[in-house]
Amino acid sequence: MNYQPTPEDRFTFGLWTVGWQGRDPFGDATRQALDPAESVRRLSELGAYGVTFHDDDLIPFGSSDTERESHIKRFRQALDATGMKVPMATTNLFTHPVFKDGAFTANDRDVRRYALRKTIRNIDLAVELGASVYVAWGGREGAESGAAKDVRDALDRMKEAFDLLGEYVTEQGYDLKFAIEPKPNEPRGDILLPTVGHALAFIERLERPELYGVNPEVGHEQMAGLNFPHGIAQALWAGKLFHIDLNGQSGIKYDQDLRFGAGDLRAAFWLVDLLERAGYAGPRHFDFKPPRTEDFDGVWASAAGCMRNYLILKDRAAAFRADPQVQEALAAARLDELARPTAEDGLAALLADRSAYDTFDVDAAAARGMAFEHLDQLAMDHLLGAR
C-alpha cells in the first residue's frame, strides 16, 4: 500500500505547528524561527494540500503597513509557486499581554473592541487568500476565580462578538463561515465553551447560526476525558463540523499536541473510520507541535508522520469495513436495527402494540448477548495488522 500523501488527500498544517520553536513554560526555544514561505515549500514537498495561519504567524505583531504588505507578498509568492491553498485562517487573541483577561470576553471594554477590529482585519486577509473557514479559539476567554467573571455576562459579550462578525462577513458578501474551537482549560484555569457540546448549544443562540460550526481538536476533547469520535459524530449529526484539528493526546493532562496517531491510537482509528464513512469533505488539518527535542529534520519527519498515520488508519478502517466477517459481526450486533426508527408507525401504533410492553419478554431480551466483544476484536485485528 502506498502511504505517500498527495494534495488530493487535503492534508493541511498550521504555520504555528511546524514553526513552533519548542518554547514552553519551563524552557526557552530549541529551534530557530521558521520562515512561513519555507514552511509552505517544505510542506508542499511532503504532499500537503495547504497551510493555515494566525495573523501573527504571518505578520509579526506590531508590523508597519509596509512590513505587513511585504510579509503577505512573500507568502503569496510561495503559495503561487507551490499551488498550496489557504482553506482556513484565525486570529491570535491570546499571546500579547493585552489579552491576559481574554479578548471577546475581557472585562476591559476597550480590549474587546480592539479584539474585534484585529479579527476583522485578518478576516479581510483570509478571504483575499482564499479561506472559506475562520476558526475562533478563545484560549484566554475564561477565569481562575469565581468572582472574576460573571459567566452570563461573558457569554452575552461572546454572542455579541460573533453576531458582529457574522454581520460583517454578510455585509461584505464574503463566502466565509466560522468554526468555534472548544477547549476545557489551558492557558486559563477554566475556558468558556469547553467542549463540542457547549459550543453547539451556544451556536443556537446566535443571530445567524447557519454561519457557525465547530472546529474540534483531538487533544482538547480528550483533556476533558471525552470520547473524541463521539463528539465528531454529534457535530456531523448537527451539520456543524466545519473544520477539524488532528493531533495526539495521551489521557487527561496538559495539551500535548502530539503528531496524529501518536496518542490514543484506538480513538484515532475510529475517528478516521467515521470521517471517511461520513464523507467529510473538509481539510484534514494537523494542529500539533513537533517535540522540542527535534531539530528541523525531526520537524519534517513529524509532519510527514501525521499524514502517513492518517493514510494507514484510513486503509485499515476500509479493510475492516470490507471484511465479510466484520459484516457478519455487525449484523450480529444489530447495527441494522439501530438504524431503523423505533416507532416508524407512529405513537398510536406503539401504544396499541401489546408486544411492545404487555407481552414483551424482558428476561429473554436481557439474556440475549450483543456480540460486541467479537466485533471489537475484529477491529483490533485490523488496527494491529493481524488481518
UniProtKB/Swiss-Prot annotation:
GO biological process: D-xylose metabolic process
Domain of life: Bacteria
InterPro entries: Xyl_isomerase-like_sf, Xyl_isomerase-like_TIM-brl, XylA_actinobac, Xylose_isomerase
Pfam families reported in the protein's UniProt record: AP_endonuc_2
Residues that coordinate or bind Mg(2+) 1: E181, E217, D245, D287
Gene Ontology terms for molecular function: magnesium ion binding; xylose isomerase activity
SUPFAM superfamilies assigned: Xylose isomerase-like
Note accompanying the cofactor annotation: Binds 2 magnesium ions per subunit.
Cellular component terms per the entry's GO annotation: cytoplasm
Catalysed reactions listed for this entry: alpha-D-xylose = alpha-D-xylulofuranose
Name this protein carries in UniProt: Xylose isomerase
Species this chain originates from: Streptomyces coelicolor (strain ATCC BAA-471 / A3(2) / M145)
Lineage: Bacteria, Bacillati, Actinomycetota, Actinomycetes, Kitasatosporales
